[in-house]
Amino acid sequence: MTLRLLEDWCRGMDMNPRKALLVAGIPPTCGVADIEEALQAGLAPLGEHRLLGRMFRRDENKNVALIGLTVETGSALVPKEIPAKGGVWRVIFKPPDTDSDFLCRLNEFLKGEGMTMGELTRVLGNRNDPLGLDPGIMIPEIRAPMLAQALNEALKPTLQYLRYKKLSVFSGRDPPGPGEEEFESWMFHTSQVMKTWQVSDVEKRRRLIESLRGPAFEIIRVLKINNPFITVAECLKTLETIFGIIDNPRALQVKYLTTYQKTDEKLSAYVLRLEPLLQKLVQKGAIEKEVVNQARLDQVIAGAVHKSVRRELGLPEGSPAPGLLQLLTLIKDKEAEEEEVLLQAELEGYCT
């Protein structure tokens, strides 16, 4: 229904539906300024865009907004949802034809690698192939199948470009918005994921910028304008300088001891959010490796919303503190039990 609404709305405005998006699930209380702020952060990877209109949907009791783009975009760049007021807003767009979308993403990849379509076909041995002609005069129905067959044998690594694990979202806002991470946990996750990517630094930088919103995005955008060849390492170093913790063990320790579980946060998520800070303290020598498990447990108990963590996990006073994996296992087992009890209670309430 929403895709049909997008098509009908664009037809009424004489617009190309592939140069527009529909954002659904917007609370009626959100004004134009609220919507534009969310769009600026959530649709940053798409480049220039503008809010064209709003409409109230009675069946959802929510607003939808029509967003205009300057160019057609591929499915790899369009987020399925964006964090905003009232939770997350859904993003609906008209997917390109399969062949055209394939070629669009392939061209983006080649551009990032500094190659042209003609160079690619020559590398594959098709020196006299019509693919070496001007791409503008070739139709996708001819070009895409030939490229797909060649790539299946010669360019399997490029699938890393087409399918990859996206980074979590970071904006630099304090406190973080819905769906956003604090810097330490975001940096830890980003560093781990980037190790798995077998792509060029240019593509890594694009994926990094894709994960940024708000102030963090603006900082890197300005840096990239001033230095188009800025590296991923330089981007991360800048973000760490601005948003990271001061390189001071005492300041780091204060941050660690004042990091508490959020009201709606699972205890297991709190432990994982705390871990990068703890590991930094160990690296700085502020906490000895021999007592890291005890230090972790002490802060989890002190920072948890419920103060009966030790008893609920069956950890007697004076007993050795469990390691990270063992602690997470205990916590997740307890969370699973609690969810089962809640589910059972809901079912009983439904049946009575």
UniProtKB/Swiss-Prot annotation:
Tissue range of expression? Widely expressed, including in the brain. High expression levels in testis.
Q: State if Cytoplasm is listed as a keyword.
A: yes
| Entry keyword annotation includes Ribosomal protein | no
Query: BH3-like: where is this region?
Result: 120-127
| A Pfam entry, by short name | PNMA
Q: Which UniProt keywords apply?
A: Apoptosis, Autophagy, Cytoplasm, Membrane, Mitochondrion, Mitochondrion outer membrane, Ubl conjugation
Q: Which GO terms describe its molecular function?
A: ubiquitin protein ligase binding
Q: Return the InterPro entries for the record.
A: PNMA, PNMA_C, PNMA_N
Show the GO cellular component annotation of the record: cytosol; mitochondrial outer membrane; nucleus
Where it mainly occurs, coarsely classed, is cytoplasm
GO biological process per UniProt: apoptotic process; autophagy; extrinsic apoptotic signaling pathway in absence of ligand; extrinsic apoptotic signaling pathway via death domain receptors; intrinsic apoptotic signaling pathway in response to DNA damage; positive regulation of apoptotic process; positive regulation of autophagosome assembly; positive regulation of release of cytochrome c from mitochondria
Summarize the PTM comment: Ubiquitinated and degraded during mitotic exit by APC/C-Cdh1, this modification is inhibited by TRIM39.
Q: Where is this motif: LIR?
A: 49-52
Question: Please, which domain of life does this record's source organism belong to?
Answer: Eukaryota
Region: RASSF1-binding, residue numbers: 204-207
Q: What are the subcellular locations of this protein? A: Cytoplasm, Cytosol; Mitochondrion outer membrane; Extracellular vesicle membrane
Supply the domain comment: The protein is evolutionarily related to retrotransposon Gag proteins: it contains the capsid (CA)subdomain of gag.
As for what it does, the entry says: Retrotransposon-derived protein that forms virion-like capsids. Acts as an effector of BAX during apoptosis: enriched at outer mitochondria membrane and associates with BAX upon induction of apoptosis, facilitating BAX-dependent mitochondrial outer membrane permeabilization and apoptosis. Required for death receptor-dependent apoptosis. When associated with RASSF1, promotes BAX conformational change and translocation to mitochondrial membranes in response to TNF and TNFSF10 stimulation. Also promotes autophagy: promotes phagophore closure via association with ATG8 proteins.
What the entry lists under PANTHER family is as follows: MODULATOR OF APOPTOSIS 1, PARANEOPLASTIC ANTIGEN
Indicate the family of this protein: Belongs to the PNMA family.
> Assembly and partners?
Homodimer. Under normal circumstances, held in an inactive conformation by an intramolecular interaction. Interacts with BAX. Binding to RASSF1 isoform A (RASSF1A) relieves this inhibitory interaction and allows further binding to BAX. Also binds to BCL2 and BCLX. Recruited to the TNFRSF1A and TNFRSF10A complexes in response to their respective cognate ligand, after internalization. Interacts with TRIM39. Interacts with RASSF6. Interacts with ATG8 proteins MAP1LC3A, MAP1LC3B and MAP1LC3C. Does not interact with ATG8 proteins GABARAPL1, GABARAPL2 and GABARAP.
What name does this protein carry?
Answer: Modulator of apoptosis 1
Q: Which organism is it from?
A: Mus musculus
What lineage does the source organism belong to? Answer: Eukaryota, Metazoa, Chordata, Craniata, Vertebrata
